[in-house]
A protein has these predicted regions:
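Catalytic domains of carbohydrate-active enzymes, especially glycoside hydrolases
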Residues: 9, 15-52, 196-213, 326, ...
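Boundary/entry segment of secreted carbohydrate-active catalytic domains
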Residues: 1-20, 26-30, 159-160, 164-175, ...
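Polysaccharide-binding and catalytic clefts of secreted carbohydrate-active enzymes
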Residues: 70-328, 346, 432
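Short helix-loop-beta junction
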Residues: 462-487
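Hydrophobic targeting/anchoring helices
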Residues: 44, 64-65, 197-198, 208-215, ...
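The substrate-binding groove and active-site-proximal loops of carbohydrate-active enzymes
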Residues: 6-12, 29-35, 100, 171-191, ...
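Extracellular ligand-binding/catalytic regions of CAZymes and related secreted enzymes
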Residues: 221-224, 405-438, 479, 558, ...
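A glycine-rich, often tryptophan-bearing local segment used as a flexible ligand/cofactor-contacting loop or short
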Residues: 518-594, 599
Length: 720
């Protein structure tokens, strides 16, 4: 019997008590929560619904932060580059930074915890040659070397929590005191925070789920002097520091800390940077220490008979759900924001929790819910995009956040979400507890491996960037594809030379010398031979962009013999190239009419003589294939996410694995329609991913087929 209620969480506030009850009934919600900027109405305590309470571990206690300024959370900042044109150089530290957000830390020994670097030579400037003038806010360097560039790396206190500041700016909150971020890792604040949590639980006995936001360090988010976002890294660790923590780190690793281990020439160790040993050591240290303290808080929540839920975002740095330390924390649940399929897999794939919940978009904020806004459109795109991923890796609950009052002003939106809630319940009932049919085992190979599973090519959460959408499309396509997907690192291969035998196809996607492509790892003899042996013995390798690319021993693409292509960087202009004939009548392109969208593509890619070019534009190869021993290689210049490109990737995986004969199993001839089978449950579904009706032929697991007409966005369930 189809469930009409449950698995849905809605927001509430003091001014929408009756409306909350109405929406609970209409959407079939069984849980209510508060949000940043709202309060939970006491009148709703006894509705029978599960009650979530958002709990901020690092803010909303300014009295404590002001009384203990030495334990305010800190972050590392690097000044801009300055060229010396005289014998003295002054660098103003707060240039182009929001003055109310950060405060320079002069309390701790700046000669140890700051660093002035000559960026022309890479040398550290001795502390005897610079000082900080508190009156001007400048670091004064003298003597300097003329026309050398210098930077200053320094510590600053976070005087306005970046998330609170963002919410205040977006919602135009007036007369709101900036919330100071305090450092829960430090001794006084640690003791206070544990006691503060107990007080909260004592006074909120009606709460069923404590929704931690989060444990305990904010991802890197900095605003400029105009309150605009200046720098963001959703995975950034630079705001997880303090001398107290760094001294512990030094003791554990046995070598002195340098600010440069975090600053990384100004790149702040973003996910495109190949991580240094020191930064990986720091991350491992942070994971262990954050997990220990998070477990203490979770244990307290359990002591009170309540569930502990973590919001995956905001102050989440160090939690790393795909790493071993996470399991020790004992969380009951994880909730994450759903921006697309890949962001859903970021938390739906998490193990060692009882359930996961997706907070869907749009958030009920005025940036969407205003006159002329179209929240229904945003909701449809969000749901249909995420649904592909849910069908591969189901979450157990869905929910929404923000100001319910705003959503109620859009009755069409209310009606659409009612339909989504019911569709989700039906979907969950049909697929719970079962691994969907997977046609092949695919490994995405990069420097980060499982720690950044599904986070490849993500700078800020689900935000488009012109420079990476052509690569992120691969990850998004995989999030809803019928493959068993793993994320592995080069270090994993070094640790286990037989690792690749577990997979049918390996994918390497990204620009040269980034962490996604691999850089110098590709000149490591163990790695290059392991990958070539894997393909030679029958495996598939798909390279996208500048795969396996690093200039070495006469090659830029180190797997040119596998992929059949090389990039012209000027060094091969003397060699004539004659292989330009296209062969579009290929298995990979069988569903494509017209051109393939390669996004930004790649310039100056040419094919080796024995390579089969599928598509080239103006003598620049965009897609090519090649055999290598018993295996096969596929090169693609870029592949933005679309339903058609998802089909191209699907066929590329099958072809590279020499599995063309497995195409017509749980398959739709129309690439706008997909089939997902749950063999152990004896069910399968056919889903229309578009906003238009579609016709297709559906193939079942035994190869039999039937024609099908589908309405817009429709999902149909069948017994096997």
């Amino acid at each position: 019997m189809e469930q009409k209620k449950g698995r849905v969480t809605i927001p509430t506030n003091l001014d929408v008590v009756k409306e909350t009850l109405d929406i609970m009934n209409e959407w079939g919600a069984d849980a209510i929560r508060d949000c940043d900027g709202t309060e939970f109405p006491q009148e709703l305590k006894d509705t029978g619904a599960k009650i979530y309470a958002t709990y901020y571990t690092t803010r909303k206690d300014n009295a404590w932060a002001k009384a203990n300024p030495d334990e305010i959370q800190q972050m590392y900042i690097m000044s801009s580059f300055h060229t010396a044109t005289s014998d003295k150089l002054e660098i103003h530290l707060m240039d182009h930074l929001y003055p109310d957000m950060l405060k320079v830390n002069t309390r701790d020994d700046i000669t140890k915890w700051w660093e002035v670097i000559d960026r022309t030579t890479g040398e550290v400037v001795p502390a005897s040659q610079w000082h900080y003038d508190e009156t001007s806010g400048n670091v004064v360097i003298t003597p300097v070397k003329l026309f050398h560039e210098y930077t200053v790396s320094f510590l600053a206190y976070i005087m306005w929590d970046p998330v609170h500041m963002y919410n205040a700016v977006v919602n135009d909150w007036k007369d709101v005191e900036p919330q100071i971020t305090f450092d829960v890792r430090q001794p006084k604040t640690r003791a206070h925070s544990l006691e503060r949590l107990r007080r909260f639980l004592d006074t909120h006995q009606y709460v069923d789920v404590v929704r931690f936001t989060t444990f305990f360090h904010q991802f890197t988010l900095i605003f400029d002097e105009l309150a605009r976002e200046k720098y963001v890294d959703w995975f950034g660790y630079s705001a997880s520091v303090s001398p107290y923590v760094l001294k512990q780190f030094e003791k554990e690793v046995g070598y002195p800390f340098r600010p440069e281990y975090i600053i990384d020439q100004g790149y702040m160790n973003n996910t495109y940077r190949i991580p240094s040993k020191e930064f990986k050591d720091f991350q491992a240290f942070q994971r262990r220490e954050v997990a220990k303290l998070a477990k203490e808080m979770v244990d307290i929540v359990h002591e009170y008979g309540k569930e502990a839920m973590m919001f995956m975002g905001d102050h989440w740095i160090g939690m790393e759900p795909f790493m071993d330390e996470f399991a020790s924390i004992g969380l009951d649940a994880v909730v994450g924001s759903v921006g697309n399929g890949a962001t859903l897999r970021l938390f739906s794939d998490i193990k060692n929790v009882k359930y996961t919940e997706g907070r869907f978009l749009p958030y009920f904020f005025p940036d969407t819910f205003h006159e002329g806004g179209d929240p229904v459109k945003e909701a449809k795109v969000n749901w249909v995009t995420a649904r592909r991923a849910i069908l591969r890796s189901p979450i157990q609950r869905i929910g929404y956040g923000g100001y319910l009052k705003l959503a109620l002003q859009f009755p069409d939106f209310v009606q659409y979400i009612k339909e989504v809630c019911q569709e989700f319940r039906t979907l969950y009932d049909n697929i719970q507890g079962v691994t969907p049919y997977c046609v092949k085992r695919v490994a995405v190979l990069n420097c980060w491996g499982r720690m950044r599973s599904w986070g490849n090519h993500m700078v800020h959460h689900a935000i488009y960037y012109k420079q990476n959408y052509s690569y992120f499309g691969i990850i998004e396509a995989l999030s809803g594809a019928p493959f068993d997907v793993s994320f592995i690192s080069f270090d994993d291969i070094l640790a286990d030379k037989d690792l690749l035998k577990k997979f049918d196809v390996v994918i390497n996607v990204g620009d040269a010398d980034t962490a996604q492509s691999g850089g110098e790892y590709w000149v490591n003899e163990t790695i290059i031979t392991a990958v070539k042996e894997f393909v030679y013995n029958g495996g598939g390798f798909i390279g996208v962009g500048e795969p396996a690319a690093h200039q070495w021993q006469g090659k830029f693409f180190q797997l040119d013999d596998v992929l059949g292509v090389e990039e012209e960087r000027g060094f091969n202009l003397n060699t004539d190239k004659y292989n330009w004939e296209e062969h579009r009548d290929h298995f990979i392109l069988a569903d494509v009419e017209g051109d393939v969208d390669f996004g930004e593509g790649k310039k100056n890619i040419f094919a080796l003589p024995e390579t089969r070019i599928l598509i080239q534009n103006d003598h620049e190869v965009q897609m090519a294939v090649k055999t290598f021993g018993k295996g096969r290689g596929v090169y693609i210049s870029g592949l933005p996410y679309s339903f058609r490109n998802s089909r191209v990737l699907y066929r590329a995986v099958l072809w590279s694995a020499s599995a063309e004969d497995e195409l017509n199993r749980w398959y739709s001839t129309n690439y706008n329609v997909e089939v997902h089978a749950y063999v152990k449950n004896g069910k399968y579904c056919v889903v229309n991913n578009t906003y238009e009706s579609q016709d297709t032929v559906v193939y079942k697991g035994d190869g039999s087929s039937f024609p099908l007409h589908m309405d817009a966005n429709e999902i149909k369930w069948y017994q096997i």
